Amino acid sequence: MTDYSNSPDLKGSVLGQSTEYIDQYTPSLLFPIARKLNRDALNIDEAALPFKGQDIWTGYELSWLNAKGKPQVAIAVFTFACQSSHLVESKSFKLYLNSFNQTRFNSRDEVKQHLVKDLTAVVNSLVQVTLYNADEYNCLPYTPLPGECIDDLDIEIDNYDIDAHSLKSQSNKTVTETLHSHLLKSNCLITSQPDWASVIIRYTGEQICRESLLRYLISFRTHNEFHEQCVERIYSDLSTQLSIKNLEVYARYTRRGGLDINPYRSTHNNDTPFAVKINRQ
């Protein structure tokens, strides 16, 4: 497996570094990371992506001052197309949002315009931004994940190194089913801090051996990679190792630094059809 944690493209990242918290609007704090780094390791051609999808970020700690100096707060939902050339490094995103804290803006719409402009410039693709007042944000209450949970399978685990070849078919019978697990854990590519997630897998194809799928997902437990990259790896491995016609992979990660990241990849949908929010978020 290719290790790109020491790539020159990651130099300058604030992850793992002591940083100064700036409270005046500073868009230059945003640090882009090329999606190509991970995709090259997976033999994914960026000119002909094998999937569609989006990365949905929720920002719970956005605040600024109005024209009179009175603090305003909002919850922000940011949607990045997976076709964008770059993603935003999460700590730089947090620092960027903090830079709004003591900056005066004339309106919430002006804040949104800055967010859209800055993020779009960093990832080279239009970013959708929706701002909610604190009392408005109830559009995603906790809902049970769709499909069957595979976490209660009684299996023995003795390997925590990702092995795509461990994925097996249960039978040649073609099925359409939705499975989910709350046992996905990966680690930050730079800092090795743990990242926790629940993952939904919906597919049409030869029936997946659930024991092999659970072992595979658990094998991410010691793996260092960004959230979006883990989901693309899961999608790629399932597509490569199994006879699957339609596939959707959606992970809901718990928040860190006031942000949660929720990547979705699909053979056929640009937007996730799963309106879910896990209770750990």
Swiss-Prot record:
Protein function: Catalyzes the NADPH-dependent reduction of 7-cyano-7-deazaguanine (preQ0) to 7-aminomethyl-7-deazaguanine (preQ1).
Query: Which PANTHER family does the UniProt record give?
Result: NADPH-DEPENDENT 7-CYANO-7-DEAZAGUANINE REDUCTASE
> Which lineage ranks, top first, belong to the organism behind this chain?
Bacteria, Pseudomonadati, Pseudomonadota, Gammaproteobacteria, Alteromonadales
Q: Which GO terms describe its cellular component?
A: cytoplasm
**Entries under HAMAP family matching the protein:** QueF_type2
Q: What is this protein called?
A: NADPH-dependent 7-cyano-7-deazaguanine reductase
Q: Reaction catalysed by this chain?
A: 7-aminomethyl-7-carbaguanine + 2 NADP(+) = 7-cyano-7-deazaguanine + 2 NADPH + 3 H(+)
Name its pathway.
tRNA modification; tRNA-queuosine biosynthesis
Which EC class heads this enzyme's classification?
A: oxidoreductase
Give the record's family classification: Belongs to the GTP cyclohydrolase I family. QueF type 2 subfamily.
Q: Does the keyword Transmembrane helix apply?
A: no
Check the record and name the Pfam families matching this protein.
QueF, QueF_N
Q: Which GO terms describe its molecular function?
A: preQ1 synthase activity
Which positions in this protein are listed as binding NADPH?
90-91, 256-257
Q: Which Gene3D superfamilies match?
A: 3.30.1130.10
Listed A to Z, the keywords are: Cytoplasm, NADP, Oxidoreductase, Queuosine biosynthesis
- Tell me a GO biological process for this protein: queuosine biosynthetic process
Q: Where is the active site?
A: 188 (thioimide intermediate), 195 (proton donor)
SUPFAM superfamilies assigned to the protein according to its UniProt record, in alphabetical order: Tetrahydrobiopterin biosynthesis enzymes-like
Record localization: Cytoplasm
> What does the record give as EC number?
1.7.1.13
Positions bound to substrate: 88-90, 227-228
Q: How does it assemble?
A: Homodimer.
Q: Does the keyword Nucleotide-binding apply?
A: no
